[in-house]
Amino acid sequence: MEERSMQKAGFLKEPIKHIGITKHNVVPMVEEMADMAFQARNLARAASIVDLMQKDKECAVILTLAGSLISAGLKQVIIDMLEHNMVDAIVSTGANIVDQDFFEALGFKHWKGSQFADDSELRELAIDRIYDTYIDEDELRVCDDTMAIIANSMQPGAYSSREFIVEMGKYIEEKGLDKNSIVYKAYEKGVPIFCPAFSDCSAGFGLVHHQWNNPDNHVSIDSVKDFRELTKIKIENDKTGIFMIGGGVPKNFTQDIVVAAEVLGYEDVSMHTYAVQITVADERDGALSGSTLKEASSWGKVDTVYEQMVFAEATVAMPLIAGYAYHKRNWEGRPERNFNAMLDAKPVNA
């Protein structure tokens, strides 16, 4: 066992560090990229649109997250955006929020690795690999168990993923864990986080353990409630902008709230006014992740005046786009919407 621990420690030596957006003013460089070609020009236009979302004080900004972003070093970018009131709601894969951000709040790290590693050796040492990044599987199991502990502490019933993630924020606070966390910062700021496929991560392992041991009286996640709550945000704040990192469920879920509002009788609801997506997916296979925002306009989801696709890898493009919008400082004076408070408010009986 001691030899195994030493072998494992040999792989887990250099932690991934998170880049922020407040130190380096990238505005001059991004503005010069506007006179280049290809994805440089697309990125510059995307940055200007994300800045417009900040400048337009009526616009609620929804950030969507797909792909392995937090493990790759983008956590601080998102925390900086939350801290400076640049984001009003987040829709994410469960892995980014639970397996990666909350995992780090528990005190664990992601580690620099190699895409050329011997995966059979990693498996023997309980090291999980995400391309060139390592995660300690034994520590991930602690994260799984913590999700079960949180579920066990809650009143049985059906919750939206947002409501469960609020409890995760409370847990960080109560246990004195690392507050430099997306989950905690969103909890502190009243910014809702939705994970429509919440069971597809450590939350799923924790919840299945919780339900297995409490078969008749347990916590469950209601994904339709997620959809209803996010749609309510659109109904209450008609003008919206979406900044999409990757595609997948978070992208489609967020685009669909326009149609959902129409289904609920709000036929004059606006399409998303602003839309930017960073992706490496290809539109030609018909899959959602690479489908263009112009295509989304045919479904009545996204307006085409202020939309931009950037075909680039997120760890390169997101800090530049978010950093540009931060240093333009048009987020100053944006109202704090605190959608969590709005969604938690009990209806007044007539």
UniProtKB/Swiss-Prot annotation:
Keyword Transferase: yes
Keywords: Transferase
Top-level taxon in the UniProt lineage: Bacteria
Enzyme nomenclature, EC number: 2.5.-.-
InterPro entries: Deoxyhypusine_synthase, Deoxyhypusine_synthase-like, Deoxyhypusine_synthase_sf, DHS-like_NAD/FAD-binding_dom
GO cellular component, one term: cytoplasm
Xref: HAMAP family: DHS_like
Molecular function GO terms recorded: deoxyhypusine synthase activity
Pfam families, sorted: DS
PANTHER family: DEOXYHYPUSINE SYNTHASE, DEOXYHYPUSINE SYNTHASE-LIKE PROTEIN
Protein family per UniProt: Belongs to the deoxyhypusine synthase family.
Broad EC category: transferase
UniProt name for this protein: Deoxyhypusine synthase-like protein
Segments passing through the bilayer: none
